[in-house]
Amino acid sequence: MRLRSLLHTFSGNAAALALAAAAAAGVLAPVPAAAAPACAAAGAPAAPPVQVAQLPDWVESIAVDRRGRMFATAYFTGRVYRIDAPGSAPVTLTGNIGANGGVVVRPDGRLLVGTGNDLAHSLTGDLFPVSKLLEVDPESGEVSTYASGLGGIDGVALAPDGTVYTTTLGGRGIGRVTPDGRVDPHWAAVPQPNGIAVSPDGSEVYVVQTTVAPGLYRIPVGDPAHPRRWISAGASDVLALPDGLTLDGRGRPLIATHASGQIWRAEGGSLCAVESGLRLSTQVTYGQGERGFSAGRLYRAGVDGRIHEVPAGAEGIPEAAGAAGTAENKAG
């Protein structure tokens, strides 16, 4: 695709600003094998990624509820979709509600989705925090405002105590919404913050820095004024464009990357690649429950609208069940 066409297509997307710059630099060409090293395999080599769903839009974020249903935000149409099981056709849950940011599922099953992840709101979000966090009913698609007064929302994370954290990619702001509704758009600051997650015990917030000096930060919840740079990407990954973030069952961060096509995992003080070859990835998440997008399975979403299961990232799945699940997904 010509650069002019790429810029025109992606001009409205804050995350795509980095993509366009990467294209101009030529980094969307194949990345050398000297990118993040492969993670050590625990056993036999895993099966390759399998496509399990397709959406008609740039998928910005995905999350799975306890019933094994996946929910996705679609950047260009601003819609929220529900996919009931691998191989199922997506159900359009909402119209264009501006749902172009992250999505999380609350314990009661309702969704929280971010808005304002366009270029204008992202670049001005630190100065003019006017974006909303919306609450969406997973059955009816009914929409209400959960919180407002946040910077343009890219990433969304939910803490065990119900606190919500957000990122604004075009600035530095990390927002916080407490369970009693208090909003602080400047709770903490990290350069070019993108993917976000909360440690299992709720004591730290993990944030991905996407550009300039990609890496991973830890923000102590008790001391948000002092974020700590935890891991820096290697020199060969300076243009990898890390994006969405999730945690595995051991609390280790996994990160989707745009340009390198790798899914990284944080191990100790370094990053390794769980999987490669999935270019323009935006988010990764684990399934839940015993059916559908089930527990222990890792899923990836991307700019291409495709959802893949990534067996290399699976955990806690008996070998027979894993093989059966993959066969079912291929059939779908």
Q: Where are each of the predicted segments found?
A:
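Beta-rich, blade/repeat-based domains predominating
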Residues: 52-70, 96-119, 127, 147-164, ...
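C-terminal closing repeat unit and adjoining cap/tail of repeat-based domains
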Residues: 252-305, 309-325, 329-332
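A short loop-to-beta-strand structural motif that recurs across blades of beta-propeller domains
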Residues: 79-82, 131-134, 173-176, 215-217, ...
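Short loop/turn segments that connect beta-strands within beta-propeller blades
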Residues: 83-88, 136-141, 177-182, 220-225, ...
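Secretory targeting and sorting signals
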Residues: 1-36
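A short beta-strand motif characteristic of beta-propeller blades
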Residues: 46-53, 88-94, 141-147, 181-188, ...
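Short loop/turn segments immediately following the C-termini of beta-strands
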Residues: 75, 116-118, 169, 209-211, ...
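A short helix->beta-strand "capping" segment at the edge of beta-propeller domains
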Residues: 36-57
